[in-house]
Amino acid sequence: MSVNWYCGNAVEDGRERRGWIFGHFIDPSEGVRSSKDVEVKWGIHPVGDKRPEWTADDQRTTLVLLVQGSFRIDLTETSVTLDKQGDYAAWGPGIDHSWEAITDSVVITVRWPSSPA
């Protein structure tokens, strides 16, 4: 039986999964972090780090919350730059995106539901 609580460190726990610490891709034996409902990422992005390719027809809702730095998100509808700690952007199903770290940045990404892309 898996444990229904967990305490950890996002940097350490996400190291093997590009920062992702919750989601369907976590083995159920690891307990509460295995979820089909939500995905959570602690993203550490050095200046110039980017996702040059656009997502394609993602059917999840996404929230990106800036912890530090400056981080640009390009959406099919617009582009936004998160500059101030606590700035965030959210978009729903069908909005494609790419991103770039304008300065060294840390962001928290939350997506739901958690499903293979």
Predicted regions and their residues:
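Short histidine-centered beta-strand/loop micro-motifs
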Residues: G31-S34, R51-D58, L75, T81, ...
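Short, conserved beta-strand element in jelly-roll/cupin
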Residues: A56-I73
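Short acidic-glycine-tyrosine-enriched beta hairpin
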Residues: E77-G94
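A generic "binding-loop/recognition-motif" signal
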Residues: Q59, I95, T103-D104
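A short hydrophobic beta-strand segment most commonly corresponding to one strand
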Residues: G43, Y88-A90, T103-A117
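A short, N-terminal "cap"/entry segment at the start of jelly-roll beta-barrel domains
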Residues: M1-V47, P52-W54
